[in-house]
Amino acid sequence: MGHAEWIGRTNTAVARSAVGKWFRLEGSGHPRERKGAYFFTELRAGLATFFAMAYIISVNANITSDTGATCVCPAEDLETHCNNNTEYLLCKQEVNRDIVTATAAIASVASFFLGLLANLPVALAPGMGLNAYFAYTVVGHHGSGLIPYSLAVTAVFVEGWIFLGLTMLGIRQWLARAIPASIKLATGAGIGLYLTLIGLSYSAGLGLVQGAQDSPIQLAGCASDEFDSDGLCPSYAKMRNPTMWIGIFCGGFFTVFLMMYRVKGAVIAGILLVSIISWPRTTPVTYFPHTTEGDSMFDFFKKVVTFHPIQHTLVAQDWNISSNGGQFGLALITFLYVDILDATGTLYSMAKFAGAMDERTQDFEGSAMAYTVDAICISIGSLFGSPPVTAFVESGAGISEGGKTGLTSCMTGICFFIAVFFAPIFASIPPWATGSTLVIVGSMMMHATLEINWRYMGDAIPAFLTISVMPFTYSIADGLIAGIISYILINGGVWVIAKCTGGRIVPPNRDDEHEAWTWKIPGGFFPPWLVRAVHGKKDFWRADDEASQLDLGVMPPNGSMSSGSPEQVAEKAVGKY
């Protein structure tokens, strides 16, 4: 038996098993089996998704540990004192290792169960943008932000359960649709610029820019031990930091070239290249200097494969919010709103990419279960000490490899589970290795600006304010507030003037170029499962049969792949693989 024949027979055998029927693989005999869904193709797609998003393990750990989490640093002169406090820095290292384990663990659980229960080829992990807002606005560098870390993870925990309630009642879909399209598109672009600024800064990036005295920001690029008494980079040392240049060329341009040639795992390849260059202790770019902190990091790195239990960030919630109620509420609302936009937008786009979208209702197969898993995993992740979990657009890498079912996500989840035991490697990835990654991710998120309606000022100005205010205030919440309020004031004012003048005074291009907006949702306000339950359908969690008549990428009951001899089915399976 040749290799191709063995693959075909295995695809056929798995398709006809209970696993194949559960995931609706082609050839399973399921009345709604998915075209082109084969066992080995799904596994390969899951690997592609993992390598496309594995960078989140180290990036999320670097960003989140910048808060100090539960490590205590004296309040006086936070920046100077904390950066030179050996005990505090050693504690931060432990937090970084905790978050590495937490990120891999929650990504494993969330991705596996979303694939198993929702049967979608979409992976979940702590979200980029949300983790930056969590770390640098809500908690702050060294805990200098709005609320302590313990309250921040409490807000994330509560947000997850609120998200679950909104999902079950259908309000989640209404909120996502009620926000004007220009604001939703601008939110993604604004977060992209926000991530870019983080990637260029010192805390979790290349160290190319920093704050200044005479201007909001200035060029930097010098080693941290060359800062002057004001903590600024002197002119004679600018752009002389070798770690910055390694990050730019090996982590930036090298990664871009790989991406241009569609090399799988390009992002993680760039990160690993910079990391490998930075690991030897005898070079000027080493991540393990001969100091107390460097020795501690190197000792952990040498373990290579080990399980690091979560210690500092496990169940760190503090339920006494009396002294920070206002800021706690603001953080909670922002987490909830951004998560609704992020998860909804990503899941919708990935479902459409996979061919599982109902254009009439703007819903997709398994949507209720997908959002339920996402919401529950947000709360579980907060117990590990992680920022909110969300769907990753990198799931498109797996879908482009042929992933069509939840088996793809299950494979990605298994890969993240294996990564839990490689914490020493992921915890030893320096920030300059991931800085260019943040810039690249930010540039990809700017693609959303192409769809913004720039022709009408009532749409363009709120969108522009949303995009620009986010990075300049270092806050996603402030950008959203600026965009929404300006949209209400501008378009509300136009509406009032039109009403008062009987429609005689309106902008000349309003009717032709203003984007359509309505709070009404095609297909009804309530989620399909609730409608089915009210109508007395016993298995209300199952989609109606007429969905199979839509072009959703599923086979009709008499699909050609569910008939024929095993040899014919195997031959077709090999061809698709």
Swiss-Prot record:
Industrial or biotech use: Notoamides have been shown to exhibit antitumoral activities. Notoamides A-C show moderate cytotoxicity against HeLa and L1210 cells with IC(50) values in the range of 22-52 mg/ml, but the IC(50) value of notoamide D is greater than 100 mg/ml. Moreover, notoamide C induces G2/M-cell cycle arrest at a concentration of 6.3 mg/ml.
Pfam families from the entry? Xan_ur_permease
Compartments, record wording = Cell membrane
Report the membrane topology from the UniProt record: Multi-pass membrane protein
Q: Which GO terms describe its cellular component?
A: plasma membrane
Instruction: Name which cysteines form disulfide bonds.
Output: none
Q: Where is this region: Disordered?
A: 555-577
Task: State the superkingdom.
Answer: Eukaryota
- Keyword set includes Kinase: no
UniProt-recorded Gene Ontology molecular function terms: purine nucleobase transmembrane transporter activity
Glycan-linked positions = N62, N84, N320, N558
Where does this protein chiefly localize?
Answer: membrane
Q: Where is the composition biased (Low complexity)?
A: 555-566
Which keywords does the record carry? Cell membrane, Glycoprotein, Membrane, Transmembrane, Transmembrane helix, Transport
Q: Where are the transmembrane segments?
A: 104-124, 151-171, 189-209, 241-261, 265-285, 328-348, 373-393, 413-433, 434-454, 476-496
Please give the function described in this protein's UniProt entry: Efflux pump; part of the gene cluster that mediates the biosynthesis of notoamide, a fungal indole alkaloid that belongs to a family of natural products containing a characteristic bicyclo[2.2.2]diazaoctane core.
Which protein family is it in?
Answer: Belongs to the nucleobase:cation symporter-2 (NCS2) (TC 2.A.40) family. Azg-like subfamily.
Name of the protein in question: Efflux pump notK'
Species of origin reads Aspergillus versicolor
* Phylogenetic classification of the source organism: Eukaryota, Fungi, Dikarya, Ascomycota, Pezizomycotina
